[in-house]
């Protein structure tokens, strides 16, 4: 197979299907030569903020001189984004080489009358092969869904476990209470291995800390109040982490969203906890958080154009907190879309309750999960936004939103990572011409 055929093969594997047992994933790793044992792993779970926290960790480790692999999901434009080595996407040849190894194993399993790896499991196995072959020092490993039964939990000896913000999402798989969802996420905790977690939700924090105590794992809570924000502008945020280890250090992050302060503190606390295993100077830590780049989370993609992949109510509330900060200074335009298994009515209500937009355009994304643009527009109108316009084609909707934004306004594109991916693709195609 060539690269395009390999990608097509993976994409044809059902994404939402019955998971194989974790023992099956472990057996796959064993038959691949246990690649996950050839590097140190930081395992990251959570509802929101996983990818950003992973990016902060990776950037700090890189600035400290370590080689680092990063496995995340989903991808926005190309599937290679899921595998980064030293903060760069892998090339097509590297992708194909790992694909061939995992495909050979999958064929053997099927021939034996066993199981075929799921979509995510296939990619996870590829990631472990890619990073082992590259000889990286560390891998920052993001879970796909949940934690307890996630394929990534087949890695048995992480150096640290990190659990980011927990809220309602994927309830059909993880449960419909914070306690149940937190229990799934806490499934990544390993006996004796330190866990660093977002303690802002008391219910989730209780579940995580109790699980850590049961397993004899040291646990460290980080909360929003641990930060003192000193500056918040269109170029980023300066803050101090009220923490004895970092003292009076002032950190700068290149993001405008306050929630990224929390994600960066989780990474900073993780580095502190691992201080006996790694050598990282204060300068490297400061450079690491300052130079972190992450797609799709309050990301400025063009002047005055910000995309955010918030796709659940908690994520949208955090988006609103940031976007509302700018409505006194700029006329705001909104481009919105969502898929049918999200609480899109609550998301829309949350946005409109706090922000006044000069223009609102809705479009449709997500393949078989898409919601008709007209349906979303009607909900905006029901929620008090009678001027909402529907435009089915994302590229055309983006062009229209850019025109309505004008030279002096700001355009926020939010509601789905599918939307973010299609906008970034449109920009690459030269939509602005």
Question: What is each PLM-predicted segment?
Answer:
Residues 1-46, 53-66, 71, 107-114:
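Short functional linear segments
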Residues 29, 34-37, 63-156, 172:
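ATP-dependent carboxylate-amine ligase catalytic core
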Residues 71, 198-199, 213-233, 253-258, ...:
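Beta-strand->loop->alpha-helix junctions that form or flank phosphate-binding loops
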Residues 74, 123-173, 205-250:
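Extended acidic/charged loop-beta regions that coordinate divalent cations
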Residues 133, 138-143, 149-162, 166-170, ...:
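Nucleotide phosphate-binding/pyrophosphate-handling subdomain across enzymes
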Residues 182-191:
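Membrane-proximal helix-turn-helix segments that form the acceptor-binding/catalytic region
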Residues 201-211, 216, 304-306, 348-410:
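C-terminal helical cap/extension that packs against the catalytic core
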Residues 416:
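Active-site-proximal loop/hinge segments that shape catalytic or ion-binding/gating pockets
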């Amino acid at each position: 197979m060539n690269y395009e055929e390999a990608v097509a093969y993976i994409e044809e594997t059902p994404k939402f299907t019955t998971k194989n047992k974790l023992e099956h994933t472990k057996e796959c790793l064993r038959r691949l030569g246990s690649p996950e044992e050839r590097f140190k792993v930081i395992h990251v779970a959570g509802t929101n903020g996983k990818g950003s926290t992973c990016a902060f960790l990776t950037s700090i480790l890189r600035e400290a001189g370590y080689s680092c692999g990063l496995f995340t999901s989903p991808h926005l434009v190309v599937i290679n984004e899921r595998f980064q080595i030293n903060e760069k996407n892998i090339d097509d040849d590297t992708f194909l080489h790992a694909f061939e190894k995992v495909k050979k194993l999958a064929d053997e399993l099927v021939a034996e009358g066993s199981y075929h790896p799921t979509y995510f499991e296939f990619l996870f196995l590829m990631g472990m092969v890619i990073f082992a072959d590259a000889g990286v020092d560390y891998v920052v490993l993001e879970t796909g869904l949940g934690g307890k039964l996630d394929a990534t939990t087949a890695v048995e000896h992480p150096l640290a476990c990190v659990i980011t913000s927990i809220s309602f999402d994927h309830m059909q798989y993880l449960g419909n209470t914070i306690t149940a969802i937190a229990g799934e996420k806490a499934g990544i905790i390993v006996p004796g291995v330190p866990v660093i977690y977002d303690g802002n939700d008391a219910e989730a924090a209780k579940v995580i800390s109790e699980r850590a105590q049961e397993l004899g794992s040291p646990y460290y809570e980080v909360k929003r109040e641990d930060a003192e924000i000193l500056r918040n502008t269109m170029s980023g945020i300066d803050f101090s982490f009220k923490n004895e280890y970092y003292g009076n250090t002032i950190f700068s992050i290149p993001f405008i969203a306050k929630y990224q302060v929390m994600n960066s503190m989780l990474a900073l606390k993780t580095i502190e906890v691992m201080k006996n295993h790694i050598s990282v100077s204060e300068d490297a830590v400061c450079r690491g958080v300052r130079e972190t780049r992450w797609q799709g989370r309050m990301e400025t993609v063009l002047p005055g154009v910000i995309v955010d992949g918030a796709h659940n109510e908690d994520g949208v509330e955090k988006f609103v907190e940031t976007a509302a900060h700018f409505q006194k200074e700029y006329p705001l335009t909104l481009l919105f879309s969502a898929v049918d298994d999200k609480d899109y009515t609550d998301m829309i209500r949350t946005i409109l309750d706090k922000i006044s937009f000069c223009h609102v355009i809705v479009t449709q994304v997500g393949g078989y999960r898409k919601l008709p643009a007209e349906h979303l527009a009607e909900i905006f109108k029901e929620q008090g936004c009678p001027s909402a316009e529907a435009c089915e084609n994302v590229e055309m909707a983006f062009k229209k939103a850019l025109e309505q934004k004008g030279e002096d306004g700001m355009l926020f594109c939010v509601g789905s990572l599918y939307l973010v991916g299609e906008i970034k693709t449109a920009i690459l195609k030269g939509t602005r011409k």
